[in-house]
Amino acid sequence: MMKSPPGQITRACQPHQVISLFAFAFGVNVCMGFTTNRVRRSEEWDEGPISVLSDSPWISTSGSCKNRCFELQEAEPPGCRCDNLCKSYNSCCFDFDELCLKTARGWECTKDRCGETRNDDNACHCSEDCLSRGDCCTNYQVVCKGETHWVDDDCEEIKTPECPAGFVRPPLIIFSVDGFRASYMKKGNKVMPNIEKLRSCGTHSPYMRPVYPTKTFPNLYTLATGLYPESHGIVGNSMYDPVFDASFSLRGREKFNHRWWGGQPIWITAAKQGVKAGTFFWSVVIPHERRILTILQWLTLPDNERPYVYAFYSEQPDAAGHRYGPFNSEMMVNPLREIDKTVGQLMDGLKQLKLHRCVNVIFVGDHGMEDTTCERTEFLSNYLSNVEDIILLPGSLGRIRPRSSNNLKYDPKVIVANLTCRKPDQHFKPYLKHHLPKRLHYAYNRRIEDVHLLVDRKWHVARKAVDVYKKPTGKCFFHGDHGYDNKINSMQTVFIGYGPTFKYKTKVPPFENIELYNVMCDLLGLKPAPNNGTHGSLNHLLRANVYKPTVPDEVAKPLYPVALPSASDFDIGCTCDDKKNKLDELNKRFHVKGMEEKHLLYGRPAVLYRTKYNILHHHDFESGYSETFLMPLWTSYTISKQAEVSGVPEHLASCVRPDLRISPGNSQSCLAYRGDKQLSYGFLFPPQLSSSAEAKYDAFLITNIIPMYPAFKKVWNYFQRVLVKRYATERNGVNVISGPIFDYDYDGLHDTPEKIKQFVEGSAIPVPTHYYAIITSCLDFTQPADKCDGPLSVLSYILPHRPDNDESCNSLEDESKWVEDLLKMHTARVRDIEQLTSLDFFRKTSRSYTEILSLKTYLHTFESEI
């Protein structure tokens, strides 16, 4: 069975519960609007021609499209259809083309057409009655009545919706563009004056981050549902389901089958709550101008028929980007101008209907575009001897499965090992899917193959040379592609919000597209279905907050244990030289209250599940110690800019002290480490950053140690010894919170103790799958971290805890050569950490909760500016 989506809501959101939602109106059309007659993609080299639904149950001669063009309801078979997707479903009435796809006299009024006699064969009208009949060309008022184009008007602040009588809410139009790289916006007013006006007059972000893989199907459906691909099930433009034993592709028939599509898209959410939705997808045979005119006509329908949510979809500039590459300015300008012209037609049409101060418009892309070509292709035949035994979904990422499901010799671990660090100039990195960076959220679905290749930007991967698609002339068919890691700058896309509900002339920080579903629900007054977004994190886009998020309730209250008077009963197999270390005197420090205000700058993290844990105070750090996991759930400390890194004296090199506040039965034992040659231990608070010689001893308490593979200690020690100090120096002090993560079933959620026992049966110490670190400072580096009264800055990591460092091909070199790159690959959001730990951070701060949610959903990408 398909896995449930990750997130707080997901264990109750099984796909078998939601697939049936597609039986509602419009749901059957979920996939076809962007699949017909598309440019061939790199990951479809081996696929056949595009298909439409054959053996249609609809009979074309069973009716006519007269007065039915682009009707909002789909006719039931055997009756024929006249809706926007009847072409894709091979279900149109015989006269659909003649009556509904008229192009006579073009799409614009000219002076000589003003006041023309109505001719029903025209594509749009310039007659005196066209306004009353709702079928004017969009420039009618400009050409025939002397009005100005919308783009030529000054920006105006629309403080409240100005809608005609009968409108119960501002309608929402989602204008989605395929392959719109964020940097295209730099072309500005000369190329895209209408889009530039939307940007400058409304709300925009420098870019919006797509989900991984940065492909069309996964991202359009994420925009519609707020779910990651592993959650909604559309994990690629092409995919294989081992339970269905069926393949899904842009060119195959399976895309028509509802069983592939999980989650609840916005149009179903609207329909379930009594809000009518217009169509979201269009067959490509319908010209852009006709799509715009149809939306405008729907807006003039009677109150009881009018939809309140619409979508327009453009196949450009993606098609041009694939063919010519994103940097071919000469060839990319025209597609961008055409999109801008269509935006202008929409806005002029809204103004003509006096709806330009009523309607909310979202202009959004699905992903970016990278420069690539056939010549930059890695062939697996240069690495593996058995490429005939595997199926590779090739291109800007690679997914590998056995050609035969009965191949008992196929071992994903062997494939990964044979592809790991084989060449010094290798342009892809192989992963078992559960080892992929957690920020990708790309593992917990049966349609995601066990072996995954992350491909370098600008490169492709293929099985062998003959798999690379070229023209018969031998020339490369494409010069651009997408699908790469979603944090790289070329994959970022555009977001603009314009209308009475969006803020005026406002720039907001970048965000991920999983958040837009909640915003769309807020714009329409809907309650969102469960999703992976963080509702309220984008409240700063809107004039008024429709939804007010609340801080989650703390479930487990901590205990504050006191130290026992004697250490005689604390035999945990650990040693420390009592004479040199003066342990009895040091144990008295347990009675001293810690420095919570210094080390818990943003309040104590809350535990959101039932468990028993203790707050342990120390001079240099605070810990939330779990008696279940025998280690801290979190440790927090603040390091000033002036802090010094000191060495560990020889007599402390192997010192581990018992903690008299925690009974031996609830502590780890040094004996467990002596008996396991594959496992060592590290420290959550680094002894090297202790503020004094006396305070250093606190770091050697057994309640500060965590199980670590020796290989991983290289990563952790470099992070603590070098990077934390560097961050503190660069950022004028930092607060660090770190701790363990247990995600053995790789569902992106906190594992229960029962779940962990299934994977580490017989182990005395539960070994984390990852460790996290949250580094927070003031956004204004002139302010010290502990005296910050402005916005905060955060970077976070989820570091894989593995017995080797094979992910880094140069891991035999000095740590300064590779550890930082590894950390950058495993950057993450605070929200990702919260879901993996069931902890809640930043609970005590003067900032608004919306600001905190924005901080939690921020991803530090380490990429250059767009």
What are these regions (language model features)?
Residues 22-64, 103-104, 147:
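N-terminal signal peptide
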Residues 57-150:
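Secreted, short cysteine-rich peptides and small extracellular cysteine-rich domains stabilized by multiple disulfide
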Residues 151-203:
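Active-site-proximal N-terminal segment of extracellular/periplasmic enzymes that hydrolyze or transfer
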Residues 375, 519, 538, 549-866:
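Domain-level detector for secreted/extracellular nuclease and nuclease-toxin modules, and
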